[in-house]
């Protein structure tokens, strides 16, 4: 027997069609659901199989590890705020190798002072840390001498050791699951095409495939855009033109992943930055900050779809082609004719 899925929102919106009553009971719901099924308003849930199921499981495990690792890091920084707040002024990030070595051997300010500059340097040399020296050790000692942290004892030290052990464990687990994720990702056909795009990493591609699954079930990138909840939601009637927003339906993790991937792309990739600038500064219908980011995210979906489906290589020229407008197209035609001696087609430029 094959199971079908009826959207609960459809049931809620359809419950008044027969009796014109907002009443909702266990007797009424089955009738409403059966009516929707007879009208063909149902769908079959998609369950990824094979490599896509493995990727979804691996990405889910990685998200759990990252969440636990961040929680452990926050607890460590809380401990430092209570007992040694000056540590966070000496080290901008608490998890530097030399800093973690000090926290394990001399967690409290009095331990740092007791160890002395020579002892700290010897400890770092024992761990083969060459990027730090006596100057950093002296800075740490001065911070410890003027510390305003609460006095701590053996229990405070033990608490920090347990927190550090938890953090180290999660960090090691993160490295293991990332290695497995990379190994599984390379089994997907044409996945290396996506990794060739500047600013696109393993986590982004793996997360995209984990949420979308097999791309062969889609006939258009707009279907993936709808799955991510980035479909434009128009609100207009007659002469009234309401505000257009995104639907925010579908897989929210996919929508979050695309948003998090586009922001660094705009900063590090010249092609994406140029398209973002065009969307936000064009004369006709310029987009605001978030709107332009969403537009670039939808374009990223189309790129992923083409590269994975057709095995094509990423082309910077084709990526920027849609920002050419009639005036720019004429100039591009003249430039192309000047350097190539051939008459290019307008279709090639648009």
Where are the language model's segments positioned?
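A detector of single, family-specific signature residues
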Residues: 1-350
